[in-house]
Amino acid sequence: MRKEAVMSSQIEGTQSSLSDLMLFEMEGMPGVPMDDVQEVSCYVNALSLGVQRIQESYPITFRLIKELHKSSMISGRGISRGPGEFRQNQVWIGGHRADEAAFIPPPANELADWAALEKFINDVPEPTDPLIKAALAHVQFETIHPFMDGNGRLGRLLIPLILVETKVLSQPFLYLSVFFKKHRQIYYERLQQVRITSDWEEWLLFFVDAVAATATQAVNIAQQLYQLRREHKKLLQPLGRMENSASQILDALFEHPIVNINKLVQLTGLAPATIGKVMERLSQADLVLVSELTGQKRNRVYAYNRYIEILNQDF
């Protein structure tokens, strides 16, 4: 989920990395502008909220989309751009002025056209294959551009939500924004081709390639993480009485690979002193499973380096 948020936001120009986001979540200081990390964090919250709403049997409607937009724009640069409200003004895509635009979405007074997309997403008048539905809904949302800002990220967020809602995925494990970012120019060209020439076929082929490549990469990463857990559990066996606590902490690091002592207390129930001793041991030269990021004696933050390296792999 965090990886999708980071990549989708990078498509829009933010500089936050996955490590920056996780450091921010531990109240550390990321190495990029705070607004960038706040925007990515808001995206994570919006995607989490969307999955929660779908699990609560909410349909994907105007109401939910507005709620998710508000959640995604609640802090950072977007806070002044009408969070959760459809735009009242004309916008354009590309260029500094409307006469330089690559594409001009419908006027604000025609946003009722969104109703047709809402019906399509909810299989009215007839159902559509989930992958095709996600692909077409993304383009249509981007074309309508219903908000003043944040349309790109929210349009990409629609894809995993539709796949979860249709039971193709149990959780938003497909990070299509990784593929879209790597092939950003083609991504934009395929969207534009649909708007100008109605070339849906090329867009669908591109989208299917994205799904296939992303799924393959996700399986590869999952296999590497499974192997990593096995290898590192074995490394803990010689730790004697510390092994059980270290094993609990390792499990927690698979959930939060950048973490502080307080978070580990919350995740494991172990005493702070015990956690401190284990983290000190895991950072020693014969193991080096974690590294301390702050250089401070208090409020230390630790990174599970190998896990992060695997998660950061690109295509």
Short names for language-model regions:
Residues 1-315:
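FIC/Doc superfamily catalytic core
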